[in-house]
From Swiss-Prot:
GO BP annotations listed: tetrahydrofolate biosynthetic process
Protein name: GTP cyclohydrolase FolE2
Role summary: Converts GTP to 7,8-dihydroneopterin triphosphate.
Site annotation May be catalytically important: residues: C149
Reaction catalyzed: GTP + H2O = 7,8-dihydroneopterin 3'-triphosphate + formate + H(+)
Pfam families membership: GCHY-1
An example Gene Ontology molecular-function term: GTP cyclohydrolase I activity
Residue stretches in coiled coil: none
Gene: folE2
Entry EC number(s): 3.5.4.16
Record key words, sorted: Hydrolase
Organism: Pseudomonas entomophila (strain L48)
Pathway stated in the Swiss-Prot or TrEMBL entry: Cofactor biosynthesis; 7,8-dihydroneopterin triphosphate biosynthesis; 7,8-dihydroneopterin triphosphate from GTP: step 1/1
Length: 293
C-alpha cells in the first residue's frame, strides 16, 4: 500500500497576512453535566488568530477539547481548563480563547396555593474568555414574569369610582349592596392591562460556582409575579392578587432586579434588561440597568 501524506492546508501561509479577532465554530451540539443532570447544549468555541501570516486555526483541536465538558460537572474551573487547552493547542497562533454554552434549565415550580406543580424552562448562556491569564465568566438567563401597568390600574379604579357614583347617587348605601355591586360585571367596569414580560440578566461571576437556580429564585422573588405552570382557580386568584400588589412599569422592574442582584456576593457586576410586551401598544417597553463593584 502506498503511504500518502495528507495535506494540511491550514498550516500554509496566508496570501493576505492579517490577524483575526475570532475564528472558531458555532452551534456545536453536545451534552453537559449540570446540577446533577445531563443537558443538551450548544457550544460556540473559538480563538483569536494573532499570527496573521497563518492561513487558519485547527478547529478539530477545539472540538476535541470540548470532550472534557461531557465527563465532568460544569464549573468555571472546568471551563477555564478547556480554554487553556484551546490556547495550548494553538500555541504561537492565538492569544485569547472564548467559549459560549447555551442550554435550557428546567425547574419544577409549585403552584401558588394548590398542591399542583409543573416545569418551566429558562434559557441560559455561559460566556467565558481567557486572555493574558485573565479569565472571565458571565452567566445569562431569561426569566418570564407578569407585569400590570400602574397607570392603567389607576385609570381602571377611577372608572369604577365613577360607575359607583352613577349607580348609587341618591341611594342609601349598605354594606351588602356594595359588596354585591363589587362582585358584579356592572360594578367592575374596567380592568388594568397586563402583559407577559421578560427579564434578561447578564451577570459576571466571582468564584467557582454557576448558581443558575439561585439567580432565578432571587430575581423571581424580587419581581413577585413569576409566570405559573399548572394552576387551579385558587392559584389564578392568588396570581391576580400578586399582580395587583406588584404593579410595575418596566423602570420599576429594572430597579427591583438591580437592588436584588447587587446583594449577591458572587456577583462582580451585571446588566439587567427588562422587556414588557405591551398589550396596549404594538411595541415593547424596555429598561436597562447596570452595576459594577
Amino acid at each position: 500500500m502506498t503511504s500518502l501524506t495528507l495535506p494540511d492546508i491550514a498550516a500554509q501561509s496566508a496570501q493576505q497576512p492579517l490577524p483575526l479577532d475570532w475564528v472558531g465554530m458555532c452551534g456545536i451540539a453536545m451534552p453537559v453535566q449540570f446540577e446533577g443532570r445531563q443537558l443538551s447544549a450548544l457550544a460556540d468555541a473559538g480563538v483569536s488568530l494573532d499570527d496573521g501570516a497563518s492561513r487558519g486555526i485547527h478547529m478539530s483541536r477545539l472540538y476535541l477539547a470540548l470532550e472534557a465538558l461531557e465527563r465532568d460537572t460544569l464549573t468555571p474551573r472546568l471551563i477555564h481548563q478547556v480554554l487553556e487547552q484551546f490556547l495550548f493547542s494553538h500555541e504561537g497562533l492565538s492569544a485569547s480563547a472564548h467559549l459560549r454554552l447555551q442550554f435550557d434549565h428546567l425547574l419544577k415550580r409549585p403552584a401558588l396555593v394548590s398542591p399542583l406543580a409543573g416545569w418551566k424552562h429558562y434559557p441560559v448562556a455561559i460566556d467565558a474568555r481567557l486572555k493574558a491569564e485573565m479569565f472571565h465568566v458571565e452567566l445569562s438567563v431569561e426569566i418570564p414574569y407578569s407585569s400590570t401597568c400602574p397607570c392603567s390600574a389607576a385609570l381602571a379604579r377611577q372608572l369604577i369610582q365613577e360607575r359607583f357614583d352613577q349607580d348609587f347617587t341618591g341611594q342609601a348605601v349598605d354594606r351588602q349592596g356594595v359588596r354585591a355591586w363589587l362582585g358584579s360585571s356592572s360594578g367592575i367596569v374596567a380592568t388594568p392591562h397586563s402583559q407577559r414580560s421578560m427579564a434578561k440578566l447578564q451577570v459576571r461571576l466571582v468564584g467557582d460556582e454557576l448558581p443558575v437556580t439561585v439567580l432565578i429564585d432571587k430575581a423571581e422573588a424580587a419581581l413577585g409575579t413569576a409566570v405559573q405552570t399548572a394552576v387551579k382557580r385558587a392559584d389564578e386568584q392568588a396570581f391576580a392578587l400578586a399582580n395587583g400588589q406588584n404593579l410595575m412599569f418596566c423602570e420599576d422592574a429594572a430597579r427591583r432586579l438591580n437592588l436584588a442582584l447587587r446583594q449577591l456576593d458572587w456577583v462582580a457586576g451585571f446588566t439587567v434588561r427588562v422587556e414588557h410586551a405591551e398589550s396596549l401598544h404594538a411595541h415593547d417597553a424596555v429598561a436597562v440597568s447596570r452595576f459594577q463593584r
